[in-house]
């Protein structure tokens, strides 16, 4: 065992006078650190952590202390002379003494700092003189350099190394990708461009992939359904002459939905129709299409605190028409023997959104363009003939007030293609009256009202009195109704068979303005405008000049008909095969759109969202708006 604790003057067993540092570098086979007095400055340069420790010769031979402590042992290792050196000789601080002089008592004392510095320099010089184990030059190559520098600097300029086979393939792929992208976004539009697409086309031959329901049903250039047969493209009206088809919907695409934004023309109602105290809730998920028909199904289903659920769709603020013919093929819901249901196919001015009572306040069912007692609340009649609050958008509204177009009386008149019911009073075979026969009421609703609600029947025509008769109900305190009831075939209900219903009409005043209703191919009755001409202190009321929307619904209400609860069965469905609109292209009074000249609606609707989007508001003031002032009642 070698005790390395001591000073540099300690002798080894083999050499009585050998320097401790030199002995560590005596041969190439053994390399170790010098472990000397930790207070010795020369020793601290080699190993600062040397302390009291005892090491075996085997440990020393293995190189304890590491490369940095021991340095390299090779043929150029410096072996100091055999004499003993002492960095701090005795008396080194006394007068006349030389700290680097040789002490006679210690054989000779020489400063070993130079030897130590040389030793450290050689330790970092590498195993061979002139070489460095820590090469910093790229020119020095080692056997594993290819892993780190696959392209030596001297070879970087060679094209074969710069590109290579793989690089060439990548370059070709990038060029192909760039060419394909350019072809897709530049070449393809150029190759497929066919020139200007005229909007005057009458047919839509293709739309898009059927997987995209909404996009597939969009129609550009024509509002005619591609599934409408060409034989239905024109119609010869008894009063209006030859008419051209301008809109149709055959409902042939299955699974259509009618939530807001789902359909180009139709919008499902989602509310309780409180205006007529209906028992059902109109749910927007109810209307759908299947087997070529629109289906409005009523279920005894608890929904929104009501016991029934059904469907209503409208074209409100999407599709409007003024003048022409509307034709609807339908099979009404319910049993032909049990009364109770209320199917409807009707139209109303676009300024009224069905079910939104604030929009109908002071607007429905006015068709009036005069400034007199007809615009006032209750028609200024103390007899209580009318409970209406007066025409809000009347002709004499002051300039600058809230009105779609000041100077024109505006309203929301209603024309019904049918309201399904059962009724007595309808002649059967000329003499027998049946209370359980299905009939349709075809009517026009007006305000202000005639005196005693009695129109001028000289301008009313009923074509077949064996199946049609004027309705005994002429209206109430909120509307005057000119209505004719016609009996139906029992098979025209519940999807068993379909029948056509609708009307032709020409807007305006005078004997040429009229409405003619029909069932199937037969006209049932006609009302010419003078039937609601001037009467008492009320001026003439024109046939609706407002842009009209289409409404299809299937309801149940105690205000419409008496029914027997225990005999009603559910579910019941109303089916609609198609809706078609015809107009005379040469007639300036016939317009397809919601903003015909002199009767705009869309801007006014957009400016009053609190009324047109909130069905909980039941009056114009409740929606947060003020009735406009007029010269007759307020002065301007």
Swiss-Prot record:
Cytoplasmic side: 1-170
Spans within the Lumenal topological domain: 192-636
A molecular function (GO) term: glucosidase activity
Membrane topology: Single-pass type II membrane protein
One annotated Gene Ontology cellular component of this protein: endoplasmic reticulum membrane
Glycan attachment points: 291, 378, 429, 464, 489, 616
Regions that span the bilayer: 171-191
UniProtKB keywords: Cell wall biogenesis/degradation, Endoplasmic reticulum, Glycoprotein, Membrane, Signal-anchor, Transmembrane, Transmembrane helix
CDD domains: GH16_fungal_KRE6_glucanase
Domain GH16: 218-587
Chain positions covered by the region annotation Disordered: 1-22, 81-107
GO biological process annotation, one example: fungal-type cell wall organization
Location(s), subcellular: Endoplasmic reticulum membrane
Family the UniProt entry places it in: Belongs to the SKN1/KRE6 family.
Function: Required for synthesis of the major beta-glucans of the yeast cell wall.
Protein name: Uncharacterized beta-glucan synthesis-associated protein C17G6.11c
Species the sequence originates in: Schizosaccharomyces pombe (strain 972 / ATCC 24843) (Fission yeast)
Taxonomic path: Eukaryota, Fungi, Dikarya, Ascomycota, Taphrinomycotina
């Amino acid at each position: 065992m070698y005790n390395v604790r001591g000073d540099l003057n300690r002798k080894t067993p083999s050499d009585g006078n050998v320097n401790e540092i030199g002995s560590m570098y005596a041969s190439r086979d053994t390399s170790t650190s010098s472990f000397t007095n930790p207070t010795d400055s020369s020793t601290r340069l080699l190993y600062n952590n040397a302390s009291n420790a005892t090491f075996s010769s085997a440990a020393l031979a293995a190189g304890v202390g590491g490369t940095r402590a021991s340095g390299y042992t090779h043929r150029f290792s410096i072996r100091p002379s055999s004499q003993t050196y002492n960095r701090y000789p005795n008396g080194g601080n006394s007068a006349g003494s030389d700290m680097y002089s040789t002490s006679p008592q210690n054989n000779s004392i020489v400063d070993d700092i130079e030897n130590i510095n040389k030793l450290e320099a050689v330790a970092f010089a590498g195993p061979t003189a002139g070489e460095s184990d820590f090469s910093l030059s790229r020119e020095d190559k080692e056997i594993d350099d290819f892993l780190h520098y696959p392209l030596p600097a001297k070879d970087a300029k060679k094209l074969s190394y710069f590109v290579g086979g793989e690089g060439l393939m990548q370059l070709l792929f990038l060029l192909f990708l760039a060419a394909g992208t350019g072809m897709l976004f530049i070449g393809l539009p150029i190759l497929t461009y066919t020139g200007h697409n005229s909007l005057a086309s009458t047919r839509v031959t293709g739309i898009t992939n059927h997987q995209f329901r909404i996009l597939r049903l969009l129609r550009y250039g024509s509002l005619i359904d591609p599934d409408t047969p060409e034989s239905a493209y024109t119609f010869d009206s008894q009063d209006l002459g030859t008419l051209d088809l301008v809109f149709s919907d055959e409902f042939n695409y299955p699974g259509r939905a009618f939530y807001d934004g789902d359909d180009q023309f139709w919008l499902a109602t989602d509310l309780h129709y409180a205006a007529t105290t209906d028992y059902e809730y109109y749910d927007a998920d109810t209307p759908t299409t299947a087997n070529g028909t629109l289906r409005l199904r009523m279920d005894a289903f608890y929904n929104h605190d009501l016991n029934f659920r059904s469907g209503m769709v409208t074209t409100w603020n999407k599709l409007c028409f003024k003048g022409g013919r509307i034709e609807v093929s339908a099979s009404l819901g319910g049993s032909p023997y049990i009364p109770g249901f209320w199917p409807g196919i009707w139209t109303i001015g676009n300024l009224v959104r069905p079910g939104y009572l604030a929009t109908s306040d002071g607007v429905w069912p006015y068709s009036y363009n005069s400034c007199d007692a007809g615009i006032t609340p209750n028609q200024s009649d103390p007899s209580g003939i009318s409970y209406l609050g007066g025409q809000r958008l009347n002709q004499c509204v002051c300039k600058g007030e809230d009105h779609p177009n000041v100077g024109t009386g505006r309203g929301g008149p209603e024309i019904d293609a049918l309201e399904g019911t059962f009724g007595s009073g309808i002649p059967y075979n000329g003499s027998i009256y049946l209370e359980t026969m299905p009939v349709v009421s075809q009517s026009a609703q007006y305000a202000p009202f005639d005196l005693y609600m009695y129109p001028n029947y000289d301008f009313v025509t009923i074509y077949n009195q064996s199946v049609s008769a004027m309705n005994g109900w002429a209206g109430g305190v909120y509307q005057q109704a000119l209505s004719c009831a016609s009996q139906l075939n029992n098979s025209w209900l519940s999807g068993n068979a379909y029948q056509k219903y609708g009307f032709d009409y020409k807007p305006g005043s005078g004997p040429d303005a009229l409405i003619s209703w029909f069932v199937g191919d037969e006209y049932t009755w006609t009302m010419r405008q003078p039937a609601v001409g001037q009467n008492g202190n009320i001026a003439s009321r024109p046939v609706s000049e407002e842009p009209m929307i289409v409404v299809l619904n299937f309801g149940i209400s105690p205000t419409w008909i008496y029914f027997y609860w225990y005999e009603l069965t559910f579910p019941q469905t109303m089916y609609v095969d198609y809706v078609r609109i015809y107009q005379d292209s040469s007639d300036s009074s016939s317009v397809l759109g919601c903003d015909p000249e002199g009767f705009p609606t869309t801007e006014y609707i957009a400016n009053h969202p609190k009324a047109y989007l909130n069905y909980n508001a039941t009056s114009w003031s409740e929606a947060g708006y003020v009735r406009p002032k007029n010269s007759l009642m307020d002065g301007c």
